[in-house]
Structures are given as C-alpha cells and as structure tokens.
Amino acid sequence: MNSGGSPLRLIVRRHERMRIAILGNSGSGKSTLARWLGDRSGAPLLDLDTVAWEPNKVAVATAEDASVSYVSAFCTSNTSWVLEGCYANLTRAALPFMPILVFLDPGEERCISNCRSRPWEPHKYASKAAQDERLPFLLTWVREYYVRGGEMSHSSYAATYAAYVGPKYLFTRAPVLDPPQAEILAWLS
C-alpha cells in the first residue's frame, strides 16, 4: 500500500500480536515512529544500530551472522515488538515473523532536515557535541543513500519492500502522531 500524498495515515488491520519492522534512510523518522509505538504499546523496541555495530567502538561492524542471530532471537523471544533501522539485511531477518513492514521514504531534503534537528541520542554518543561532530558525515551518508549500492541503499530497501508478501506500508511523508490518527491507535490494539 502506498500512503503518499495528503497527511499520511497508518491504515492497518488489527493484530493479536503487534510486530512492526520499520526501514528507511537516516532521518526518515524511523526512531520517532518506533519510540511512539513502543511507548504506547509496551512492546520492546530494537534499534538495529545497537545490533549492527560493536558497542563502545566507532564504526566497527558486528559480524553479520551474529547480528542476524540477535534479530532472530529478539523476534522469537517477544510476542510483540518494534524494530527499526537502516539495514535491509537485518530487517529481512525479522520478516519470517510476519511483521507489518513500514518503509519510510520521505525524500532526501526531509531526511537532511530531520538529521539537522535530531536530539541527542545518548545510546549512540557520549554527548550532543560528539553527535554533532559526526553530522557532516551523516548528511553525506543521507545524500548518497539514493545512489549507492549495498544493504543500506534505497535500492535495497525498495527491493526488500517489494519482495515482502506480508502486510506492508510505504510512506512518502511522516505519519501523523500528534494527535494520533484513529488508524494508528487501532494498530496498537
């Protein structure tokens, strides 16, 4: 389903278990949506950055098989969950559990704007200053998303979305959360 156009609506069916996988570029709104859903549902949240990278090391990737195993274990051990990240391969590890797949694709300028106004992420950076030091790299990363290849590219996300046979939603604008639309609240039931 495509929810581009006027203010986005999350039109979803009721699920006995809420399982949601959110995929998109840096700055697309993944963390905001995931936190919102997790806060209101009580479902555990997995930020894939915490799985993809070695803790307390800058830009040292965790072995892919270990990351995939962690995602599978997280999905298996929780009845309901929300996961979000910039990793098509890790998102695909969650798809056998038949979550709702949400692909946030608001465009480069919206992602750049969101990155510039991003609050401090203490689980990723020691300080807001340390986070801001990495901003030029992040903005370059966001811009290259549309032309690079590999698991963290627009083409890989689009292919993952297209191949998924479960419930899925493509958003070209951020979902409206304040106030939440009735459809979003139904998603939490």
Predicted regions and their residues:
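Conserved substrate/cofactor phosphate-moiety recognition/catalytic segment
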Residues: R35-T79
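Conserved lysine of the Walker
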Residues: K30
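Walker A (P-loop) ATP-phosphate-binding motif of ABC ATPase nucleotide-binding domains
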Residues: R19
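Glycine-rich phosphate-binding loop used to anchor ATP phosphates in small-molecule kinases
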Residues: S67-E109
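Hydrophobic anchor at the beta1->P-loop junction of P-loop NTPases
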Residues: I22
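NTP-dependent small-molecule kinase module
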Residues: G5-I11, H15, R40, E144-S189
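A glycine- and Lys/Arg-enriched "phosphate-lid" helix/loop adjacent to the NTP-binding pocket
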Residues: P106-S153
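The conserved Walker
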Residues: S26
